[in-house]
Amino acid sequence: MIYIGLPQWSHPKWVRLGITSLEEYARHFNCVEGNTTLYALPKPEVVLRWREQTTDDFRFCFKFPATISHQAALRHCDDLVTEFLTRMSPLAPRIGKYWLQLPATFGPRELPALWHFLDSLPGEFTYGVEVRHPQFFAKGEEEQTLNRGLHQRGVNRVILDSRPVHAARPHSEAIRDAQRKKPKVPVHAVLTAKNPLIRFIGSDDMTQNRELFQVWLQKLAQWHQTTTPYLFLHTPDIAQAPELVHTLWEDLRKTLPEIGAVPAIPQQSSLF
């Protein structure tokens, strides 16, 4: 099994594609990044609505709130974690992964706090950790310690591939904004648990995106034999994300025939 989705389930320009709601999005994709929870907890009635708009084969990958990962730096936040997991509990059967997106200031010295935090989480869910501190990408003892600790706990290291967006010409505000915000870190395709998560940050150059994605075809084919990967496809202007799906899908299907036909959404050319 492989899960493929986008960083969000709605965008104003997707309305013209027929994607007007989470329910409609879920007809085309089997998972989604849950970025909204990084910034604020959804109201209980909103969580219930999300449950109503999806089925049990759909997967949400929600981020832990920034109040936990950034402000508290994983310390003395048991109440915040309980509040978050309780709020999201109606979606429990559809949680693909809860993941920590840690700031670049969270370095090797903070690893004891990470281990304590992960060890305190309920065992019923799958977890991921996305790091941004340079030493975790230096292939030294610090990175080895991180990977070893995640592996021992069965926690996935989230993989960010931002090569395409940082290789793009900065000819639009969307590109420039993405280049400012998306970390420019080495791509370390490390498998630490059974649900690897890849965030592929494309550019607006679909030919270049396809070229840079080729390395993932072999990796996904390999990982797919023993794990359940998640793949999220980004573009600087999220309106173009469905176009990236169309660009990469045929290559993905040749590698992973089980994904079936490309999602039946129109091409993006009419939007730009």
Question: Residues of each region from the PLM?
Answer:
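Residues lining hydrophobic/aromatic ligand-binding pockets adjacent to catalytic sites
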Residues: 1-272
